[in-house]
């Protein structure tokens, strides 16, 4: 939030000056990439709305040939997860689900009651024991999961390596990088 407090766009009267605005935003800090991305996305969304067209049309892209992206379902109650899944299931080809709590299996069963779309998992470093992580990955594979992101705490590099070697699914690092 501190980064966003630095952003003052009053000097720009035209939101279509995307390159100038985003260069200014980028110059405010060498880091804060998530906050910069939020400004970038909001600005592009505004311009798209002003033009009355989605960006794939503005850029002349064929939506059917555009690479897929995921819709992320965060950690929440089963009712909220069910509602979010229903909301996005017909608009995305793959879901990304945040796990790493005691009710992980319940969350997956809730999603599976709504859709059979492929699912990528981000365990958010939530599985502390490597055998538990591996057991979860085997169970998740049976549920149509296609990949696992950051299953264990980033400090447990040896355990992450062990899980990665044993896993029937691809395992990716995030916080470990």
Where are these regions (language model features)?
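Metal- or metallocofactor-binding catalytic centers and their adjacent structured scaffolds
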Residues: 1-50
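Gly/Ser-rich oxyanion-binding loop with an adjacent helix/lid
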Residues: 43, 57-59
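Acyltransferase donor/substrate-recognition loop-hinge adjacent to the catalytic core
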Residues: 60, 86, 109-113
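Catalytic core of soluble alpha/beta enzymes
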Residues: 97, 102-177
């Amino acid at each position: 939030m501190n980064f966003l407090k630095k952003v003052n766009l009053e000097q720009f009267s035209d939101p279509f000056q995307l390159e100038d605005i985003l260069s200014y935003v980028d110059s405010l800090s060498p880091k804060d990439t998530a906050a910069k991305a939020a400004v970038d996305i909001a600005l592009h969304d505004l311009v798209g709305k002003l033009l009355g067209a989605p960006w794939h049309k503005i850029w002349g892209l064929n939506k059917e040939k555009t690479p897929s992206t995921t819709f992320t379902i965060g950690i929440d109650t089963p009712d909220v997860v069910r509602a979010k899944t229903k909301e996005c299931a017909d608009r995305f080809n793959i879901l990304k689900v945040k796990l790493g709590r005691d009710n992980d299996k319940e969350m997956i069963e809730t999603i599976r009651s709504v859709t059979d779309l492929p699912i990528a998992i981000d365990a958010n470093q939530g599985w502390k024991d490597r055998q538990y992580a591996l057991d979860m990955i085997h169970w998740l594979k049976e549920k149509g999961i296609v990949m696992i992101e950051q299953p264990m705490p980033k400090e447990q590099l040896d355990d992450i390596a062990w899980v990665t070697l044993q896993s029937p699914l691809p395992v990716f690092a995030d916080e470990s990088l």
